[in-house]
Curated annotation (Swiss-Prot):
The protein's role, per its UniProt record: Accessory subunit of the mitochondrial membrane respiratory chain NADH dehydrogenase (Complex I) that is believed not to be involved in catalysis. Complex I functions in the transfer of electrons from NADH to the respiratory chain. The immediate electron acceptor for the enzyme is believed to be ubiquinone.
Protein name: NADH dehydrogenase [ubiquinone] 1 beta subcomplex subunit 1
UniProt record similarity statement: Belongs to the complex I NDUFB1 subunit family.
Membrane topology: Single-pass membrane protein
Bilayer-spanning residue ranges: 11-27
Source domain of life: Eukaryota
Primary localization class, coarse: mitochondrion
Intracellular or extracellular location(s): Mitochondrion inner membrane
Keywords, sorted A to Z: Electron transport, Membrane, Mitochondrion, Mitochondrion inner membrane, Respiratory chain, Transmembrane, Transmembrane helix, Transport
Native source species: Homo sapiens
Keyword Membrane: yes
Cellular component terms (Gene Ontology): mitochondrial inner membrane; mitochondrion; nuclear speck; respiratory chain complex I
Pfam families linked to this entry: NADH_oxidored
Subunit structure: Complex I is composed of 45 different subunits.
Length: 58
């Protein structure tokens, strides 16, 4: 039990930093999904695109 507590005390950074990265990536993807729901609702982006024109919301 003492060894487990010592390991946690010594290496907590090695667990929290990757967890923060993974949680940040997950939240970023969810935010992007939420924002794409409003992609064509804005008056600025509602117009028809020219045949050679690319989408602006990549």
């Amino acid at each position: 039990m003492v060894n487990l507590l010592q390991i946690v005390r010594d290496h907590w950074v090695h667990v929290l930093v990757p967890m923060g990265f993974v949680i940040g990536c997950y939240l970023d993807r969810k935010s992007d999904e939420r924002l794409t729901a409003f992609r064509n609702k804005s008056m600025l982006f509602k117009r028809e695109l020219q045949p050679s024109e690319e989408v602006t919301w990549k």
